[in-house]
């Protein structure tokens, strides 16, 4: 499979890509390890071979780029190659990133990490608990893919209305 061609990202797409980057920027240094970036591409549903991923990474870094880390501009270059118009596909990719242990659901700890990383202000444990209860429609203590899709769609609709 050839690497997809880059396209211009819209403001919302850039914001979403940067939220994902921020999750992997563990030390808030505006960099993420290349090894994590490769994992991010895989978790986001990409089926590139190791060679294709390395070619994309090399292109994103540029000729004098850091071989161990990737910055936000490089990450946005990568995002422009895989971002899709299809909302459900986009939501599913985000779910896979947030489902850190890959068990098909987002548990409280994963949800707490997300909510405290992507929000403008970190949420308290009580606020995270309340948000989890709201998102966990069937009350089984985890957020599955349909619940996550509903949560994201509700959030997008609320943002459009405000």
From Swiss-Prot:
The modification N-acetylalanine is found at residue 2. The modification N6,N6,N6-trimethyllysine is found at residues 96, 117. Ca(2+) 1 binds at residues 99, 101, 103, 110. GO terms for cellular component: cytoplasm; myosin II complex. It is found in: Cytoplasm. Pfam families: EF-hand_7. GO terms for molecular function: calcium ion binding. Coiled coil: none annotated. Keywords: Acetylation, Calcium, Cytoplasm, Metal-binding, Methylation, Muscle protein, Repeat. Ca(2+) 2 binds at residues 136, 138, 140, 147. Residues 12-47, 49-84, 86-121, 123-158 form the EF-hand domain. The exact function of this protein is not yet known. It interacts with CAVPT, a protein also of unknown function, in a calcium-dependent way. This protein binds two calcium ions. This is Calcium vector protein.
């Amino acid at each position: 499979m050839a690497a997809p061609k880059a396209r211009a990202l819209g403001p919302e797409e850039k914001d979403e890509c940067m939220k994902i980057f921020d999750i992997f920027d563990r030390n808030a240094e505006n960099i993420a390890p290349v090894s994590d970036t490769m994992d991010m591409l895989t978790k986001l549903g990409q089926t590139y071979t190791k060679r294709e991923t390395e070619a994309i990474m090399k292109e994103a870094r540029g000729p004098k780029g850091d071989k161990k880390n990737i910055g936000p501009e490089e990450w946005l270059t990568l995002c422009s190659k895989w971002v899709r118009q299809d909302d459900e596909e986009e939501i599913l990719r985000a779910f896979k990133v947030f489902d850190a242990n890959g068990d098909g659901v987002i548990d409280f700890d994963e949800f707490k990490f997300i909510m405290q990383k992507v929000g403008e202000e970190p949420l308290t444990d009580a606020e995270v608990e309340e948000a989890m209860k709201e998102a966990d429609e069937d009350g089984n203590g985890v957020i599955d893919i349909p619940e996550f899709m509903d949560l994201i769609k509700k959030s997008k609709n609320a943002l459009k209305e405000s």
